[in-house]
């Protein structure tokens, strides 16, 4: 069975084609700048070589169509015909409380995603464009939606509700939803496979730390809490997002800066976090380099960043009555040893003991805690696309 996984943003499409017989990636790439000048596709060829192809793409339908043409291209394609694609799986950022698991797409699913656009206007609108483009080009191929927040749907109400009048939750569905759920689900399952443990007996804290970052508490295979909230702005400090901030600080700044609500949201999402503190970059690699060269604000940002992750680890250990495994994943979590070490330092009282040599690892599955550490700390590279492909295959087989 061959499954195409799509992640459609407002002006981009990331794709991977899987052969589910052995979970191998047959093709991968990304379309950028849809609807803008100088649109292009970055393709990873079967031999591993990367190629950039310029192509005019006024809308998502043309973007999807061009992806299809690349997949079947006689020279660089991975398949001979689109008939070889058995299904298409989509990443959907916001499923609200309408979708608690992955679903096969029909009209009601489309309508549901559209109804949630006010919770994730940029993301969900892009996802819908991708869904509809595939439907126009391959109407007979089943499509599946895998929701970013579905894994977090097992949170108890006392964890996901905000302390505001209850009728606002009932009327507007204002609550903690969480994000990166497909990644948290993948690494929590994969780490137990890797360690040979039963997930139903483990208390796991998963740290998805990339430019966007979130921490989740996974108790006996189910998410019981997560750091992101109604939107991906809440929680730990991120590349350009503030993370948790006193709401009164927001209204105070709106008054001082003369910003409207949407302008303030953009400010907290795009000009804050590590970028806001350093004034240099949202890229943690650049911040580590700047700190090493003596930049004091870069050093401050690193301390703030790790400190906030550490606080969430401690909080979630308390929420679960202890912790057995801590997992690091995503761009920063998989590759930056300093962030991992600083975030775990001071957690010896929980039973965390790091192995500094093992912690040198980058981007591969590894145990990075000491042999005598009561808590096992691991790096597990995430694979959200494979999780989406597996969900898609499972739903088709269960039909």
List PLM regions with ranges.
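Short beta-strand-loop/turn "lid" adjacent to the catalytic site in phosphate-handling enzymes
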Residues: 71, 75-123, 144, 151-159
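Glycine-rich phosphate-binding loop of actin/hexokinase-like ATP-binding domains
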Residues: 151-255
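N-terminal glycine/serine-rich phosphate-binding loop of ATP-dependent small-molecule kinases
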Residues: 1-96
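Conserved phosphate-binding/catalytic loops in two-lobed NTP-binding clefts
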Residues: 337, 341-384
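Adenine-nucleotide phosphate-binding core of ATP-dependent small-molecule kinases
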Residues: 266, 273-277, 284-319
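Glycine-rich beta-strand-to-loop/alpha-helix junction loops that act as flexible
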Residues: 9, 90-93, 209, 323, ...
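Phosphate/pyrophosphate-binding loops at sites that engage ATP/ADP/AMP, CoA/4′-phosphopantetheine
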Residues: 70-85, 191-198, 313-324
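General beta-strand structural signal in soluble alpha/beta enzymes
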Residues: 90, 121-125, 142-147, 153, ...
């Amino acid at each position: 069975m061959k499954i195409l996984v799509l992640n459609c943003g407002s002006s981009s499409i990331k794709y991977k084609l899987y052969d589910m017989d052995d979970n191998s990636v047959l093709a991968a790439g990304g379309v950028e700048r849809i609807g803008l000048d100088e649109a292009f596709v970055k393709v990873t060829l079967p031999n591993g070589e990367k190629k950039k192809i310029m192509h005019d793409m006024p809308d998502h339908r043309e973007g999807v169509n061009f992806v299809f043409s690349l997949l079947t291209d006689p020279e660089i394609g991975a398949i001979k015909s689109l008939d070889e694609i058995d299904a298409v799986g989509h990443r959907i950022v916001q499923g609200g409380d309408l979708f608690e698991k992955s679903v096969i797409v029909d009209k009601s699913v489309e309508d549901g995603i559209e109804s949630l656009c006010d919770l994730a206007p940029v993301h969900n609108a892009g996802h819908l464009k991708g869904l509809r483009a595939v439907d126009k080009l391959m109407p007979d191929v089943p499509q599946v939606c895998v929701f970013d927040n579905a894994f977090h749907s097992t949170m108890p109400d006392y964890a996901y509700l905000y302390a505001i009048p209850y009728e606002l939750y009932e009327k507007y569905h204002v609550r903690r939803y969480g994000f990166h759920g497909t990644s948290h689900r993948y690494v929590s399952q994969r780490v137990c496979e890797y360690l040979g443990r039963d997930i139903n007996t483990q208390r796991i804290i998963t740290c998805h730390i990339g430019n966007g970052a979130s921490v989740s508490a996974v108790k006996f295979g189910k998410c019981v809490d997560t750091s992101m909230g109604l939107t991906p702005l809440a929680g730990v400090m991120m590349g350009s997002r503030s993370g948790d901030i006193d709401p009164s600080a927001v209204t105070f700044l709106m008054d001082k800066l003369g910003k409207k609500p949407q302008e303030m949201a953009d400010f907290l999402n795009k000009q804050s976090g590590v970028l806001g503190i350093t004034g240099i970059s949202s890229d943690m690699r650049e911040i580590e380099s700047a700190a090493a060269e003596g930049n004091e604000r870069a050093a401050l940002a690193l301390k703030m960043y790790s400190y906030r992750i550490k606080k969430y680890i401690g909080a979630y250990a308390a929420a679960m009555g202890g912790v057995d495994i801590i997992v690091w994943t995503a761009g920063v979590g998989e590759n930056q040893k300093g962030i991992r070490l600083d975030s775990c330092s001071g957690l010896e009282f929980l039973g965390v003991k790091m192995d500094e040599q093992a912690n040198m690892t980058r981007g591969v599955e590894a145990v990075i805690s000491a042999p005598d550490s009561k808590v096992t700390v691991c790096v597990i590279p995430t694979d959200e696309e494979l999780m989406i492909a597996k969900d898609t295959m499972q739903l088709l087989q269960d039909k």
